[in-house]
């Protein structure tokens, strides 16, 4: 029976009871190698650096969530991005990248791939015209995050996809914040969806992992070859935990979105909060695009309070329920200082131009009762206000 509804897909996509035992959950196939019936005759797997039965089930599940062939899963989200680069780029090639993106992506491009002759241009991907102007005859890939980390800036995927088709360039969309449940880049014209499965997809702070999804079978085969060659496949146990997390993904995202909406609305009304960034707010500059492109707004928001860096640091040190930690998209509410944590490797000029100021706070709203999250933020904001009065914010260096 086809899985036509999102909740049903999340529970059953790519999965069936184990034929050997009847176990309703996919087993963890913790095996290095697989016995072959004869030379060149096997049951689909030969060595777990190349493929693994548990990983393959997760790949089928993720692909089905986006009406695509099985995805390719990796040990981390950054391993997925690295494999994408190795599959597509050569010395002399050029990449156009959204100016606001994860610090690890910036590090990969600026510090690693540049040494192999790959050039990257970081541009304001909110404007399809700016993206189009940045494409050169050497451009092989446009890579955007939407919503972007940590400012939630949006890229019009359909418009940029049209630009890329016109130029003969592939478009990859980092869809980590939204997952296939809230946004489907391939349906909007993208060639590749990029995921850190560590985040919402697994959703319980239990794993690290990554995935690439595409409807281009030749590209998927190339990505599997790269993964086998560099040894970056996801482990069976991590895949099993991720499969378990996906079963509640739509349910969790509905709650994450509702809680984030409540917290964002409260922050926006707070007299000490100077800026709130959340696509679900009518005041968000790209709210109309969010309504058109997304099927929900997710659990991530960002905000600033009076007092800049001093106040922001004091707030993060004062939270009690919320946890000061990197990562996002799990059941616990996490608070992060992007400028010093997730985006610490991004040059200050690029950060500030993109709106990632020293005082910006990123909040991954969890599944705790929003009243408790709000109460914790409220007391932390008061502590931060007192700290800012005692020690005025220093001028930016």
Q: Model-found features: residue ranges?
A:
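Short amphipathic alpha-helical segments
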Residues: 43, 208, 242, 247, ...
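Conserved C-terminal alpha-helix-loop-beta "cap" of PLP-dependent enzymes
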Residues: 275-361, 365
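Conserved N-terminal alpha-helix of the aminotransferase class I/II PLP-enzyme fold
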Residues: 33-82, 104-112
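Glycine-rich phosphate/pyrophosphate-binding loop
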Residues: 20, 28-29, 37-57, 61-64, ...
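N-terminal glycine-rich, Lys/His-bearing helix-loop that initiates the first secondary-structure elements
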Residues: 1-45, 393-397
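Acidic-histidine catalytic/liganding microenvironments
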Residues: 65, 267-271, 319
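Conserved PLP-enzyme active-site core in the AAT-like
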Residues: 12, 71-272, 277, 393
């Amino acid at each position: 029976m086809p899985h036509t509804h999102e909740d049903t897909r999340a529970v059953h996509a790519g999965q069936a009871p184990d034929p050997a035992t009847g176990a309703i959950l996919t087993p963890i196939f913790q095996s290095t190698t697989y016995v072959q019936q004869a030379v060149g005759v096997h049951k689909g797997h030969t060595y777990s650096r190349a493929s693994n039965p548990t990983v393959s089930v997760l790949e089928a599940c993720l692909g089905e969530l986006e009406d695509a062939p099985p995805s390719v899963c990796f040990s981390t989200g950054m391993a997925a991005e690295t494999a994408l680069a190795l599959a597509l780029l050569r010395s002399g090639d050029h990449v156009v990248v959204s100016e606001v993106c994860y610090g690890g992506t910036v590090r990969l491009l600026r510090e690693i791939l540049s040494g192999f002759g790959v050039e990257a241009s970081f541009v304001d991907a909110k404007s399809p015209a700016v993206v189009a102007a940045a494409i050169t005859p050497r451009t092989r890939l446009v890579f955007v995050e939407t919503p972007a980390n940590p400012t939630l800036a949006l890229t019009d995927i359909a418009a940029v996809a049209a630009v890329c088709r016109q130029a003969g360039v592939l478009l990859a969309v980092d869809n980590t914040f939204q997952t296939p449940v809230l946004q489907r880049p391939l349906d909007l014209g993208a060639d590749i969806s990029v995921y850190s499965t560590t985040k919402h997809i697994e959703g319980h702070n239990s794993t690290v992992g990554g995935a690439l999804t595409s409807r281009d079978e030749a590209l998927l085969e190339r990505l599997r070859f790269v993964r086998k060659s560099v040894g970056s496949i996801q482990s069976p146990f991590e895949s099993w935990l991720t499969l378990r997390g996906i079963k509640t993904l739509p349910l969790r995202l509905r709650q994450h979105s509702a809680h984030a909406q409540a917290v964002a609305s409260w922050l926006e009304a707070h007299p000490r909060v100077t800026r709130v960034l959340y696509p679900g707010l009518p005041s968000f500059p790209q709210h109309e695009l969010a309504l058109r492109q997304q099927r929900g707004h997710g659990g991530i928001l960002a905000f600033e309070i009076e007092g800049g860096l001093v106040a922001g640091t004091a707030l993060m040190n004062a939270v009690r329920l919320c946890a000061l930690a990197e990562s996002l998209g799990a059941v616990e509410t996490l608070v992060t200082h992007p400028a010093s944590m997730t985006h610490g490797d991004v040059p200050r000029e690029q950060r500030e131009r993109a709106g990632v100021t020293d005082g910006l706070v990123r909040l991954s709203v969890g599944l705790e009762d929003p009243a408790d999250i709000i109460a914790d933020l409220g007391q932390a904001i008061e502590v931060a206000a007192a700290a800012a009065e005692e020690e005025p914010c220093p001028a930016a260096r």
